[in-house]
Amino acid sequence: MVAIPRLARLSVPAWALSARGRFYATVSTPQTLVEKIVQKYAVGLSEGVKVRAGDYVMIKPEHVMTHDNTGPVISKFLSLSCSKLDNPRQPVFALDHDVQNQSETNQKKYKKIQAFAKEHGVDFYPAGRGIGHQIIVEEGYAWPGKMVVASDSHSNHYGGVGCLGTAIVRTDAAGIWATGKFWWQIPRIVSVSLDGRLSPGVTGKDVIVALAGLFNKDEVLNAAIEFTGSGVEHLSIDERLTIANMTTEWGAVAGVFPVDDKLKEWYQGILRKAELRKFISPTVPSTVGAKVHPRLNAARLDDAMTNRVVADPGAHYAARLSLDLSTLVPHVSGPNSVKVATALPKLLDPPIPINKAYLVSCTNSRASDIASAAQVLRGKKVAPGVEFYIAAASSRVQEDAEAAGDWQTLIDAGAKTLPAGCGPCIGLGVGLLEKGEVGISATNRNYKGRMGSPDAIAYLASPAVVAASAAKGVICGPESMDLSQLPQYEQPKFSIIKEGAAGEEKPVEVDEASLEPLLEGFPAYFEGPLLFAPQDNLTTDGMYPGKYTYQDDITPERQAEVVMENYDPTFAATARELRTALPTASSPSTLPGAILLSGYNFGTGSSREQAATAIKNAGIPLVICGSFGDIFKRNSINNGLILIESPSLIKDMTERFAKDGVRNKGGKDGKLTVVPEGWRIKVDSQRGLVTVNMGEEEEKTYPAAKVGRSVQELWVNGGLEGFIRASL
């Protein structure tokens, strides 16, 4: 064990500069594409500071989109005593989820949202105009080199056009309406190289289905992906949008493609269409009276292409994955899991009968997808006993498909049309899977119960495979597909290289003068005894049982009594003992409290806020893990619970205290929660150091992410709601 003295300059190994262990950033350090885009939208940074993966930053995004959930966001916004939007041009409302629902209740909700948009001058797209993500792209809100967020998990979609898109929660959306900004921890960044060229009949959908199936061990969980490689230029923009869209299912929080000449040509086509359509139909406030479209215009495109945002040579990535596109054949995802991907030829014998087929969603229902399905079904009929549902990604898409004759081709084949919107993809409206049925869909999720009955089976595939299956009644490829001409590989060629290994011992000096001062009122140190839960994927239900979730009158004290009940029934009592025995703080700048340690993906599962507040109410001000579930992270920091990632510390704790030296088996002492006697932890908020004192003589210091200024702002104001009120 080595103690690190307090010196003016510290020497640390290069591995400590990983996404979770960076001490500081110099101006000369190369940045990734994601880091560069975030740099443009980060506010409140000290002069000369370059953002890095792992940093907590305050972001002022270009736009924030909400859909049917705009209603609850309005309620949250008004509950904060907000009367006006910080910037009416920033939000975009697009009603797209429950568009088939003509009930009085739903129509009243939609009218309320429209009235709010009109009152505040927000761009509003009514039900039937299309899926929000498609609108954000085709109306130019998402733009190369920009950052756009939405209160929907498929915001990754915008990465298909070189725009950093990521999901936020509803409270964040209300905060952006009020203040123009939200906090974000820049995730670890993974490079995915797509090499070679797809064979005829293989599509972008096959690429992402294969990636999610091949790399199914959480290689990109909660990461931001940057796509590179020689194969990118051969992918159409629609294919890139499909791939970026489904990086969500792969586990990533963003997936961004580079800006290239193919994207420029695509946008030139979009601009021509916008001009032909007079761009202001339907009218939205941002275009009223404009002679030139405020987003879709040649000058803006020229600027984006001339000043392309690209990664610096030598930029650091947490891992590098690669897939040889030339070795890929059509793939099918499922049943009922995106982590299971099978080459289409392997599913042909014995045949798998289907009951329903779907060409809907923001993933694969653009004009090129509809054309692909129409080519397969031209002159054919949907098989007897099969229902084939189609819905365009937007009304603009449907107009294009109708003009090309493709929409009518599908109708003539027996397809049943639905309005432009989400529909069956999210289990709303007509045509859902019934008990015992099998469906194949060009959508993005096939989780059990997602598209109907939990007793149904769902597969995902490309539009051509979906259409061919609808015509034949079994899962199959188009008749034009010659299997003998496809790449003859048992599986595609792929690889993974992890960077930042602990074996790299290049010393890096850290200058104390580069450290940013902490906000007044934020603790310089967190210090106290530790509790170790040696468990990966500890769910929010384990932290706070569902049976308490809707007890709205439950007190903070009661939350503390049931915290971690489903994981360890003795946890609450253990935490209480530590809380009552806390010594006096070693200095006025130190916040005393027990500190919880656990494994990876801590807080996976449902979005219940009480999982975070129960831990905080149990006297635990800070949690240290290998990684956190993204929504849990947002809920925690929004409620003043500090989270720190330190994989090296968790590794040592696991080896020393977990049964058999691995997590998920409890502790060596037979307990689910380990409390090492006499051990204490001290977290240095400013430097990103975690010092573990193992008694009077021994201690060891670990690198961790520093507590960023954005998190400090929320904490000193008592959480997100207090921060918003203080900002008004």
Swiss-Prot record:
It catalyses: (2R,3S)-homoisocitrate = cis-homoaconitate + H2O. It is found in: Mitochondrion. The gene is LYS4. It comes from Cryptococcus neoformans var. neoformans serotype D (strain B-3501A). Its EC number is 4.2.1.36. InterPro entries: Acnase/IPM_dHydase_lsu_aba_1/3, Acoase/IPM_deHydtase_lsu_aba, Aconitase/3IPM_dehydase_swvl, Aconitase_4Fe-4S_BS, Aconitase_4Fe-4S_dom, AconitaseA/IPMdHydase_ssu_swvl, Homoaconitase_mito, IPM_dehydratase_rel_enz. Binds 1 [4Fe-4S] cluster per subunit. This is Homoaconitase, mitochondrial. GO terms for molecular function: 4 iron, 4 sulfur cluster binding; homoaconitate hydratase activity; metal ion binding. Keywords: Amino-acid biosynthesis, Iron, Iron-sulfur, Lyase, Lysine biosynthesis, Metal-binding, Mitochondrion, Transit peptide. Its main location: mitochondrion. The lineage of its organism: Eukaryota, Fungi, Dikarya, Basidiomycota, Agaricomycotina. GO terms for cellular component: mitochondrial matrix. The keyword Metal-binding applies. GO terms for biological process: lysine biosynthetic process via aminoadipic acid. The keyword Iron-sulfur applies. Pathway: Amino-acid biosynthesis; L-lysine biosynthesis via AAA pathway; L-alpha-aminoadipate from 2-oxoglutarate: step 3/5. It is an enzyme of class 4 (lyase). Residues 1-24 form a transit peptide. Belongs to the aconitase/IPM isomerase family. Catalyzes the reversible hydration of cis-homoaconitate to (2R,3S)-homoisocitrate, a step in the alpha-aminoadipate pathway for lysine biosynthesis.
